[in-house]
Amino acid sequence: MAKKVRELELPAIVDETDGTVIYEGFPDDVSGITTATERWAIRKQAKVGNVWTTSWANGNQKKINAWDDRATLTYSIIPLFSNYQG
């Protein structure tokens, strides 16, 4: 089963592309994996105007992506509380 990002977990790697997009990588385990290994959860923060949005690769926090693929993955905003009923 793929692990998910833990609350208050800090990213192991950060890529600030151009001042409007920041990628943060959360590895399954920092020992023995590379940036090409599909064991990363990737968070994307994007700024449009004065508003920042936070989204996750494949719309979840599971550690199933390769950090090297961060620019080509599909990102979705996920609810802060997964059991939120609205």
Residues covered by each model-derived region:
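Intrinsically disordered, compositionally biased low-complexity regions
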Residues: 1-86
